[in-house]
Amino acid sequence: MDTYKTIVAPCEGILTEKRSKFIAMAFPVTTLEEIKEHLAVCQKKYFDARHVCYAYMLGHERTNFRANDNGEPSGTAGRPILGAINSRELTDILVVVVRYFGGIKLGTGGLIVAYKAAAAEALDVAEVVEKTVDLTLDVYFEYPMMNEVMRIVKEEEPTVVEQDFQMDCRLRLSIRASRMPRLRERYEQLALETGRIRVGEE
């Protein structure tokens, strides 16, 4: 699988359940540092809220995730939020749900339903985009090999990320993961035939 889904921009949803108010916010993120920054902002903005719960998912393989109940009964907040993320197969996303207690206890089952529904309120208005997993390949070659190297670029259509055309030339190419083996194979074959280029993958 070399595609994944994430959201384009932050979005928000609000849910009221038995006088408790749930404010859900979803953010596109790619690092733990970004997540910490968003959480700090939310905790400061909603300092008077009873609970600030969250869940996140990172990486195109969707293996880096966490759910936090922030004082709610175990498993009643973070996991339902994560469930809303999983049901949409999203990644590189943080969802925060703030709860203002309305005086009526919701019970364990009620909390699970409410937190998942609140997260869904935000995610239902999110603009979702499908992205490709791209890999990069460095090609080092002598200047006289320029035509052969660029012919492969034209035919395979990778994105040229960086280029340096001195006596010792270098191209950094980016291409969808599923197409990388063919691109690499073509340059390795050219290297075998000429001995005047070499390839390296990041």
Named regions from a protein language model:
Residues 25, 52-54, 92-96, 138, ...:
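Structural motif
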Residues 77-125:
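Active-site beta-strand/loop microenvironment that shapes enzyme catalytic pockets
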Residues 140-157:
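Short amphipathic alpha-helix segments
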Residues 159-165, 191-202:
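Conserved short beta-strand edge segments in small beta-sheet-based binding/regulatory domains
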Residues 173, 179-182:
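Terminal, non-globular segments
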